[in-house]
Amino acid sequence: METRTERLSQRDDERLWLAVWLGLAVITALALWRLRDFPYHLSWPAALHGMVEVLPTTLWAAVRIWIFWAWSAAVIAGLVLRIDPEIDLADAILGGVGGLWALGYFLGVLLGPLGLFNTATLWSLLALGTVWLWYSPPPIPGATPTTGQKLALLATGLLAVSMLPLQLASPVAPFMDVLAVPSSVQRIVTFGVYLPFDNAAYGVWGPAAQTPGLELFLAMLGLGADLHAGAGALAQSQVMVPICALMIFATWRLGKTLFSDTAGGIATLLLFWTCLFRRAQGVRGTAVDFALIGLGLAFFLDPSHRRTLIALGAMILGTAVASHSLNGGFAMIVASAGVLFWLAENDYRRFIAGVVCLAGTTLIAVPDIAISTAHHLPYFALAASIATGIALIIVASARLPLTSRIGNREALRILNISIIAGFILAVLLRQSQERFSLFHKVSEDLPLLMLFCFAGFAAAIAISWRDDEAPIPYAALAAVALTLGLVGEYIDALAHMPQYQTTSMVMLWDVAIKLWDYWCPYFLVFPAGFAVALAYDRWSGPAVFFVLMTLLIYPWYQISDPVDYDSVEHSITEQWAFNLQTAAEGYWSGHSDRRWTFGVEERPLIDLLEKEIAAGRITTATHILHLTHDTSSWSLVQFPILTGIDDDPIEVDHHPDNLYQMGGRVRGMSELSAAVAARPPYILEQVPPPAVLGETPAGYDQILNSGYIRLYRRDDLAATPARHNFIYSNLVAIAAIIGIMVVMRRRRSADGDPSVV
C-alpha cells in the first residue's frame, strides 16, 4: 500500500513538473514576443549568419582549447582523488577545472622567465599525469546530481544558448577595455618567454591593470592548444562559455558552503540579474575572477573542514588575487574572517593552520602585488614566493585531520546573528546619513535582488535563533563580504586625495565602481538564493521554481534606450538579445572589421610585423612608436593583440590627467620630438605626421603604406634570426618523458612480481 502511494505521489509530482515546464515555455514565448521591438535583435539565424566567416577559425580554436582544458582538468581531478579518495566527485572535478588556472599561474611564474613555459612542457606534463593515472587509477565515487547542481546546469544551459553563438562569432573578445589581456598573452606565445615586469604589450594602461594570473592561464591554454596566429585573442575569446560555466558552478559551491545546496543552485540563476555575464564575455579579470573567488572561498571555508579542500581553496585564492588584485584582495578579507570563525569554534589547531595557509596564499600573490604596484623584484624572489607559499599551504593543511566537525555551535549562532543584524543596521544608518550611498546605487540597479537578499538575511537570523533548525554556521560571511561595500565608500574617498595619486595606488581609485558593479551584486545572490531556497524546500518546489523563472525570463521593465544595460536588472531573454545581436553584427564598431578589428588596410601591418619577428629584427626589447589620434579601443590600431609587440602610443587628443593611464606608455604630441630623438626601431603612423617628422623620418625607411597606415623602420636594423636551443627549451619535456619511462618500468616490474598486489 505504501509503495503504491509513493508511486502515485511520484506520478503527481512528475505531472506537476511537466506543467511547470510547459508554463515556462509559454512565458518564454510571451517574453520573446514582447522583445520583438527591442533595440537588440533576438535572432539565432542572424547570429549564425554573422559567425559564418570566422567560424572555421573560432570553432577549431575552441575545440582545441576545450580538449586541452578538459583533459588537463580530468588529470588534476584524478590526482585529487588519489590524494583524498573520499572527496566528493563534484569537488574533485571543480578542483581540476579551477586548479588548472592556478597551475597555469604557478608554472608561468616559475618557468616563463626561463623560457620553459611552452607547448612541449605542458603536453609532456599532461602525458606524465595521464600515464601515472592510467597505471594507478583512483577510485571514482558514485554521485547523483543534487538539486543545486541541476539548477547550476540549467543556468549554464540558459546562458550557453546565446553565449556560445557569441563566442564562435567573436575571434576577439567583444567588450571594451579588455584588449590588454590578449596582448599580454600573445607576447608570451610570440616570444616564448614571460617577463613579469615587461609583459604589458598594449601600452595604454598602467601596471595596476595587469592580471598575471589570468594572462598566464590563457597563455597556457593557447600554448596547450598549440595556437600561433592570434593565439592571445582566441585563447581569450574561446573560453567565454567554459569560464562562465566555471563561475556558475563556483557560485553554486559557495552557496552550498554559506547556506545550502539548493540556495547555491538558486544563486546561480540569480546571476542573470547582475552584470557579471554581460561583463564576463570580455574574459577580463574584473568579472571572471569571481570563478576563482567563489571556488576558493567555497573550498577553504567548507563546513566539512576537509584538509584537501582547505589546501585547494588557499591556492585558488592566491591565484584569484593574481587574476584581479582588488577583487581577489576582497576575497582574502572574507577568508580571514572565516578563519576567525574557526577561532570562535575553539578549534585552535584549525585556526593556526588557517592563518598559515593564508600566509601561503599571500606569498602566492606576491608576484601580482609586485607587478601591480611597479615594484620590480628579481626572478628568484618571485619564484621563491610562489614555491614557499605552496609549501606552507601543503604543510599546514597536512597537519590537520582529514575532516573535522563544526564546534561551539552556540558561539557561532550568536556570531552569525550579531554580524548579520549589525550589517543590516549599518546599511540603514549609512543610508540615513548619505542618500546616494553605495547600497542605494546597488538597490536602484538591482531592486528585486536587493529585496530577496535582505529577506534571506532576515530568514538566516530567524533560523540561527532557533535550536531545531539545520545549522548554517558561516551564513554571516556573506554579510562580511557585503560590509566591504560600506568600508569601500570611505576608501574610495581617501584614494582620490591628491597625495594618493601614484602608480602604486591606482588600483584603489576603482574601489567604489568594483564594489557596486561587481562585488556587492555577486554576494547579494547568496542570501537572496537562500530566501528562495527556503520556500522551494519547505513549500512547493515546482510552484516556487515557476514563479522564480517567470521573474527571471520575462522582461517586466525595459529601458527605452538601452545603450548601457549592463548594471541594470535584466531578464534572461534580454541577455539572449544582447548576445545574439552582437554575434550577428560584431562588436567592434569603428573598425573596418567588426570581429577581428583588423580589415584589409590593417592586415598587411600584422603580416609584415610577423615577418620582422621571424627575421629577428623585433624582439621583446622592441617598442613601436605609434602616432594616433587617441587611444580609444574603437579607433586605435591595436597590433599588440595579434603580435605581442610593445606599443608606445603618441596621441593627438592627449589627456595627461587620465589617472587610469598613469604608469602606462601613452604620451602627447608635445613629447614626440623627444621620442623620435631616442631613435625607436619602428614608427607607425595612423594619422598624418606633424612637421617634425616630415614626409619620411630621417634615418628611417618606409616599409609599409597601406591605406591610412604607414610603417617606418630604422635604417640600421639588421636581420638576426633568433637561435633556439632545442635541448634547453625542452628540458621539462625531457624530464617528463624520463618520468613516464620510470612509471611504465615500475608498473611492468610490479606486474612481473607476484608479491606485489
Label the model's feature ranges:
Residues 143-149, 345-352, 400-415, 457-498, ...:
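Membrane-interface helix-loop-helix junctions at transmembrane boundaries of multi-pass membrane enzymes
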Residues 150-294, 586-596, 627:
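Active-site lumenal/periplasmic loops and adjacent helix-entry segments of GT-C-fold
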Residues 83, 293-310, 320, 340-347, ...:
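Membrane-interface transmembrane helices that cradle and orient dolichyl/undecaprenyl
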Residues 1-145, 344, 352-436, 713-757:
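Membrane-embedded, hydrophobic transmembrane alpha-helices
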